[in-house]
Amino acid sequence: MGDPRARAARTKRDRTRRALLDAADSAFGSRGWARTRVEDIAQSAGVSAATAYNHFPTKHALLAQVYAPIINPLLVQARQDIAAGRPVTEALSDQVRALCRLCARNRVLTSAFYAAASEYTIKIGALPDPGDDADPRTLVPMTEALELLIGYGQAAGELRPYPSARDLSGLLVNTVLIRNVNRPGESADITAELLLTVMFGALRPEELVGAERPFPAAR
């Protein structure tokens, strides 16, 4: 049955981790990236800053662990859509709309993630390293769901092969993140309309022929 002391230690670690994540969610979600300190999060969670850093190596990693559960369902849905053989245009349309809704619903937290990812990118000056457990871009692979679906459609010949799935998914996600910061009053539907027009304009231009606004925001 295991060592009771070891079980108690694991339980304590799990509770501490949960308390830190809850405190971080509240802090980043209300104060954003720049005005939130790990020390303040630790105090709210009832632990020392050293304990917080034992669980999360950097402020960037802590924020990423808070934000990842918001984004992970998109990747789950993309994999399910591919496994079910769902039409890729439908899957991509729903994926883009869902991404825009999630970002709008969690606007301050999304802005904090964008700030953290940008700061880390500038710091290391390189693409994400899968082995870097402090890189928010690795811990929250925001582009992966779109990249999977676009790549799937391109491999099946349903979408044009250029731009590549990686390049286009990155462009789309960066656009969402930037507009989330620069246009805080913009609705998710408006953002999604823009992204869908750009995406299908590149991958399925025939979808746009004869329509001034083929993906109206009112949908």
Stretches with model-predicted labels:
Residues R13-D25, I41, V66-I70, L74, ...:
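Generic hydrophobic, amphipathic alpha-helix propensity
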Residues Q80-D81, R97-A104, A115-T121, L196-L203:
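Helix-loop "lid/cap" segments that line or gate small-molecule binding pockets
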